[in-house]
Amino acid sequence: MPCPSFRSGTDQQDNRQENMFVRKIATALALVIASTGVAFSQSPTRIQQFNDWGAYSYQAGGGKVCYVLSIPKEKAPSGVDHGDIFFLVSQRPGQNISYEPQAMMGYPLQENSKVNVTIDGRNFVLFTKGNSAWVENAAEEPALVAAMKGGKAMSVKAISRRGTETNYTYSLAGITAALNQIETCK
């Protein structure tokens, strides 16, 4: 029979931080599903957490959708309400979509603006629509995903509809394991 474990004050604080992270992720799941514009028959399920990246799945009309998602470690400028900010990479085998990176902001992006993602000095340009952004040149999606797997941190710069320049820093710890987890998504 397993022994009971007791949480120290630090463990309780870690648990509160984890619960806050899970609540933010739950919000992200709802946003991801809403952004697909597809009715679904099943709520998203968290498959597993890998450091700063979680792996998730849900059933959609076109089949199973799997994705990895993280929230930024740092947000700038500090004096503005950013809302819920996420970066995710989705895979939709039923629609022949593999590893599609997407930035989701908690605010509308400036029309016709670009979002710049930088990893280890390499820049990727994303086009915007509403509060989301996708890789401008789909042929660069695999290169962005490879850079994420090989990098330590990722910077995402955007401009809000109001003209506020924003910058987010994401940890890439766990991205490779999370992507490996959804590789078998069918």
Model feature map: region roles:
Residues F6, R16-Q17, W53:
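Alpha-helical and His/Cys-centered functional microenvironments
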Residues D14-L29:
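Bacterial N-terminal signal peptides that target proteins for export
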Residues V32-I33:
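Classic N-terminal secretory signal peptides
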Residues S41-K186:
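A generic "folded-domain core" signal
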